[in-house]
């Protein structure tokens, strides 16, 4: 199990982006959250199998999200196991 931290840049607040991300993550069986940041980005923290996390990352970059994603910067770590469900924050 791994942990992906993704900073999503672009027009991603107030457009249903966190809800959409939550729905995709739950479909993939991931746990974590999506949270608006004061600077306009959305922070996505997700844990699960690497292949499922990579699928979520591909979806975040797909151009089929609500709003408009300009850039996604990700970081990989070992899963901490401290998350349950997938929520919008």
From Swiss-Prot:
Keywords: Hydrolase. InterPro entries: Acylphosphatase, Acylphosphatase-like_dom, Acylphosphatase-like_dom_sf, Acylphosphatase_CS. Its EC number is 3.6.1.7. It is an enzyme of class 3 (hydrolase). Coiled coil: none annotated. It comes from the Bacteria. It catalyses: an acyl phosphate + H2O = a carboxylate + phosphate + H(+). Pfam families: Acylphosphatase. One of its GO terms (molecular function) is acylphosphatase activity. Residues 3-89 form the Acylphosphatase-like domain. The active site is at 18, 36. Belongs to the acylphosphatase family. This is Acylphosphatase. The gene is acyP.
């Amino acid at each position: 199990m791994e942990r992906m931290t993704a900073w999503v840049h672009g027009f991603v607040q107030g457009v249903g982006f966190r809800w959409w991300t939550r729905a995709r993550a739950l479909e993939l069986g991931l746990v974590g959250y999506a949270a608006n940041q004061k600077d306009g980005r959305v922070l996505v923290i997700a844990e699960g199998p690497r292949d499922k996390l990579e699928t979520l990352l591909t979806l975040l970059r797909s151009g089929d999200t609500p709003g408009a994603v300009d850039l996604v910067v990700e970081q990989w770590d070992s899963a901490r196991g401290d998350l349950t469900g997938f929520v919008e924050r």
